[in-house]
Amino acid sequence: MCGIIGLFDIQNEEKMRQEALKMVRKIRHRGPDWSGSYSAKNCVLMHERLSIVDVEHGAQPLYDTKNQRVLAVNGEIYNHKKVAKNLKNSHDWKTHSDCEVLLYLYDEFGSDFLNDLDGIFAFCLYDPKTKDYFIARDHIGIVPLYIGWDKNGVTYVASEMKSIEAYCEKLQEFP
């Protein structure tokens, strides 16, 4: 069990980073092994890690250095080695994490790879070049994920509702 926080379409990076730090404290119990963060002009990602696969090198958020995409995941991709064999291009793998494959699947297939995954997961992927973000979770919804919006159009995503409920006008379980 890990914990993730994602804030998208933000206006004030420094202010929202500070708010995200408050949010992530509420889910710190989900990941005692590592706290990681990423912030940019339009996005903040936070991750609380419970180490299961690649204990030494799987710290998140994960980065695709070629495309500059960033990924925060709560979950486990059981068939990560199998789906990695479907990749046609060479990629600069940084870890042995089962989740890193999501960056490269997105690179090659866009969002059309979810049906190929066997696992339990919820993730936020951000592309700073296009300012696009991709949020998904496993088909059954085993891994919890919540999404909400504030009056300024900021999108909030979190592993636990309690971390974002004070910020959102509308809040729901991620479909």
Where are these regions (language model features)?
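Cysteine-centered catalytic environments shared across enzyme families
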Residues: M1-P175
